[in-house]
A protein has these predicted regions:
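Short acidic low-complexity segments
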Residues: 256, 267-280
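ATP-dependent helicase/translocase motor core
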Residues: 1-219, 224, 228-247, 256-259, ...
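Signature of the SF2 helicase/ATPase Hel1-core->accessory helical subdomain module
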Residues: 292-303, 307-364
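Short beta-alpha junctions and helix-cap segments that line functional grooves
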Residues: 89-93, 207, 236, 274-275, ...
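Short gly/ser/thr-rich secondary-structure transition/capping motifs
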Residues: 249-251, 262-271, 295-301, 325-326
């Protein structure tokens, strides 16, 4: 038996000569849809003395991730060289698709594709495809929307662009997309649990941005329990909101900001409360506040009572495990007053006691 004419080709050659052209022929573009060598996990950090390095064996990297649009993933494609069967990469493709929360997995050795469709839209889980039978972006997106059960209104919100900024990690993508999708579908209480150091504030920013830009949520309140969290959030992750955003306070100091080049500047924050009259300027769309600043003294309580109970469409509570779900909590006063707003709780450690339950309040 003669060797396959592709047998001398490397996996990279197979991708370049057969898989990528098949994707492009089906309408997938490098600019919008295709990401090669997509890192899901960079690998564990191994420390030896003063030196450290990434353990490449624990790295997870998909050969291709296909997107409906930037940051809205649809499918994973795993490649193997021609010495392997067409479907040899499917176990990896399924693993990566599950991490990304997408239902479509493909495997290829350059001779064709094996397509695994977890939506079971036509009752078939896996099928073989020739190179020229790869689904178009529109076909996969239609299957995806039908699988999700989205109406056109929900689809509009779920497909709203991310704010231009750093590339989110795969777990941030999952948290952002699933939260936006849940709220678009009508869920009004969401508990978002992310480990310390995984970028909760950046994740919250992208959720708020997409809900705001889609028009689903027009007036938003972000609550935290420390001034530094509010101030640094305003000059860093929430910086793209500048002009539409203000601190719900009559006073603030200049905030130090270090940019990507290491340059230090002092920035003044826009304030929503008049220092003399304590009257709130309601012309802003994004408000950030310490919970103490709106539920402390009677004068401070009057600040949030200046808003009608239906003023805010969305409230995001940072570090909600600090007691926001307790019946006698200061934050709970705010959440109860603005009960008609969609409410998101952010935490690294959900609080579950006989008296306080973040899960009971926000849901799982």
């Amino acid at each position: 038996m003669s060797a396959s004419p592709k047998s001398h080709l490397s996996e990279t050659d197979i991708c370049d000569r057969f898989i990528t052209p098949a994707l492009v022929q089906a309408g997938w573009t490098r600019e919008q849809h295709i990401l090669r060598e997509y890192t899901l996990r960079p690998g564990r950090v191994v420390v030896r003395g003063q030196a450290s390095h990434r353990d490449k064996a624990s790295m997870l990297r998909a050969d291709y991730v296909l997107f409906h649009k930037p940051n809205v993933p649809l499918a994973v494609v795993e490649a193997k060289d021609a010495k392997h069967s067409v479907g040899a990469g499917m176990p990896q493709a399924i693993q990566y698709a599950e991490l990304l929360g997408v239902p479509f997995s493909f495997a290829s050795n350059g001779d064709g594709f094996v397509f695994r469709d977890a939506t079971l839209s036509d009752g078939v889980l896996e099928r073989d495809l020739t190179l020229d039978q790869f689904p178009t972006p529109a076909e996969l997106w239609a299957k995806y929307c039908a699988w999700k059960g989205w109406t056109p209104a929900v689809e509009h919100i779920a497909a709203t662009d991310y704010a231009p900024s750093k590339t989110p990690r795969y777990y941030q993508l999952g948290a952002i997309n699933r939260t936006v999708e849940a709220i678009a579908a009508g869920q009004n209480r969401v508990l978002l649990v992310m480990a310390t150091g995984t970028g909760k504030t950046y994740t919250a920013f992208q959720i708020i941005w997409r809900l705001w830009k889609s028009g689903a949520k027009k007036r938003i309140l972000f609550l935290a329990d420390r001034n530094i969290l509010i101030d640094q959030t305003m000059v860093n992750d929430f910086r793209p909101f500048k002009g539409a955003m203000a601190k719900l306070s009559p006073h603030a100091k200049g905030v130090e900001r270090v940019d990507a080049q290491g340059q230090v500047t002092i920035e003044d924050l826009d304030l929503a409360v008049n220092k003399t009259t304590k009257v709130v300027d309601k012309s802003y769309e994004i408000y950030l506040s310490l919970y103490q600043a709106v539920t402390g003294t009677q004068e401070e309580r009057n600040i949030y009572k200046q808003f009608s109970p239906d003023f805010f469409d969305l409230i995001v509570v940072d570090e909600c495990h600090r007691g926001s779900a307790a019946e006698d909590s200061a934050w709970r006063d705010i959440l109860t007053y603005f009960a008609s707003a969609t409410q998101i709780g952010l935490t690294a450690t959900p609080k579950e006691t006989e008296d306080v339950s973040n899960i009971d309040y926000f849901g799982e």
